[in-house]
């Protein structure tokens, strides 16, 4: 007999295996490994808890009461289901928050600039305040996400749980009480906390001003760049990890192909933005190095003059009284060498930054490096580098990253566009093959046009999706539920099915097939074997019967009507005859028609297994009322009865009047009478016993 632990593991395995349909083979390998490791750790912890606390036992339904160690995490509030709609929507929002954070962090590198007036390094105060505020807003949203992660159950809820994500109703279950410990022990909490540490803010507002006051202008750039990369690179991994986890959990991110293309373009734009910001900061460092060399060659110049008197500049004008600073600000030699665009100083790849480091336009300082990043990542070259090792390494990293990013961008967009246009291309290829075949077989123009119209109508209805094949590949229970959901409302529109119970309707929905007919299509000819029953959903059909002397009896079938009722008589007749019954009418579409088809074998199955349903008097009356054969017979019978009545009245009136030509008059009346009786006798009357034997 299976133990309690084995039963719990088996039930958990069945729940986990039911979610495989959400995953893809390429994206979920690492996530599945992580989930397996997490589940193993949880099982080990549960075994330890069982050994330590033997009081833990099963409650009703095989669920356990939570221990005191787990109850402290219940104080966080309502436990959230990771697959609930609210959590999935928040994951999408948080993905955009991560992208915003990746765009905001490089803005810290633009806060350093060179004063064109005093030729000193400073921090743009207003830009620093703006970037700090934006970073604080994204950090608050990250903190909110950490709080949500504490409340999300690390184990999926039971299938009968609440759809709103509340898995903590009716007492703590074994799967729902384990919430926060795996999130903490898997280092997810510490990693989420690391990416929101205020390292750039501390460096910008504390470290950099102190370094500027000491005159370490080149060290300032190095400290800011190292701090930025130290947190930015893990932040990129954090965003990618969240993206893949979200895709693994729900199977898609935003549900459309264009969102996938947009995410790839955003990632490429953010990469260009980060590369341009680093390029700008290294350009500031090259300018500071040039100014430092000029200061060392100038008599009376102190390195502290390379940093402004106020390290954080807010745009206020301050009177400079220091003569040494005034002399340095008026040094035209240093200005022409370091800050002039036509300088002979070897800036290398940072040549274009000369016009930016001393610019007062913040928009230009941000947009131009983004343009440089997009251009460099897209062209893989056009960089004039010096022999300095740091510049060479930077150029190598930028070019290699650009090659990888462009390759990934083109590949992903190609995949997304192929997913969008593959069906259309398959349709065009199929139409070319059909045109070639029709031309080879010399089909008439009318046939060709009918084939084209049918293919267009089928494409317009389903956009190339083979619904029958798609549903047939699903498990039997899921297939029946889906077809019952899709077809029930339409099947109930057929009056014949309105008085049947749900079991019969479920079997009918499981066997009906969706059919589309173009205008002017002959569906069935009179005298052919009836292959299926047709239930009109949209459009109109013309049902015609050929009487004697070339006379036709026609009626129109609209939504709610059906044809092929001969199959009902054939299935319920005793003894049963294997030969299919002949059709009593010809069906022609008057417009594009959508209908449900129930094949003869399916009708036979339904009538044999649910014979009691057709004994119902309401079903009998509905079948007779909506049957084209019964309607035609009833119309002819009423019409002939009326004509006989009118003929009787005519004969009665003629008995009081002397006719001028009594013989010819009587002869014509006799012919009419015989013609009427011949019509009623030769009209196809349905077998009255067909529905009495049900």
Swiss-Prot record:
Effect of gene knockout: Loss-of-function mutation results in the loss of the hypersensitive response leading to broad spectrum disease resistance, and displays a lesion-mimic phenotype.
Domain IQ, chain residue ranges per copy: 631-660
Disulphide-bridged cysteine pairs: none
One GO location term (cellular component): membrane
Membrane topology: Multi-pass membrane protein
Gene Ontology biological process terms in this record: plant-type hypersensitive response
Entry's transmembrane regions: 93-113, 127-147, 188-208, 217-237, 252-272, 393-413
Record-given protein name: Cyclic nucleotide-gated ion channel 4
Species the sequence originates in: Arabidopsis thaliana (Mouse-ear cress)
Organism lineage string: Eukaryota, Viridiplantae, Streptophyta, Embryophyta, Tracheophyta
Gene name, Swiss-Prot/TrEMBL: CNGC4
